[in-house]
């Protein structure tokens, strides 16, 4: 039997935010290992310019990233064990469970870049 899609019942904004956070964890310039959780601490959330912002080699539309500035979304991810508390809105830890969670929408919101 295949695994259930979205078993923690994240809403669309939470799924988008987690997808972006997962991608941000691959950037060694803004991350560090969190010894307490075994996860990855993001210590630099990129700022949008115009209608998008860059996440490594990918581009995210600003409209898909509103959860990065929504404390309620961060708290929901913490409650569900996908993140650990950081300093909103500057840093957050993506736990091993969060790193491995299949949001199913990664390719819908993370686009290739042409500049």
Give residue ranges: language-model regions.
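Short, amphipathic alpha-helical interface elements at domain boundaries
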Residues: 2-65
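Short, amphipathic alpha-helical interaction segments positioned at domain boundaries
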Residues: 3-5, 79, 97-115
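Short, solvent-exposed secondary-structure capping/transition elements
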Residues: 30, 85-89
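A generic structural signal for ordered alpha-helices
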Residues: 51, 55, 61, 72, ...
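Short amphipathic alpha-helical interaction segments
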Residues: 62-81, 88
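Minor-groove-contacting beta-hairpin "wing" of winged helix-turn-helix DNA-binding domains
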Residues: 90-95
């Amino acid at each position: 039997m295949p695994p259930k899609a979205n078993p923690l019942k994240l809403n669309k904004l939470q799924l988008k935010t987690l997808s972006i956070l997962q991608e941000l964890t691959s950037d060694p310039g803004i991350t560090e290992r969190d010894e307490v959780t075994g996860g990855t601490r993001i210590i630099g959330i990129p700022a949008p310019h115009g209608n998008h912002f860059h996440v490594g080699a990918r581009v995210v539309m600003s409209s898909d990233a509103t959860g990065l500035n929504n404390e309620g979304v961060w708290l929901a991810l913490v409650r569900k064990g996908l993140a650990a508390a950081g300093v909103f809105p500057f840093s957050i830890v993506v736990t091993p469970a969060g790193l491995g969670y299949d949001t199913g929408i990664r390719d819908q919101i993370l686009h290739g870049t042409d500049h």
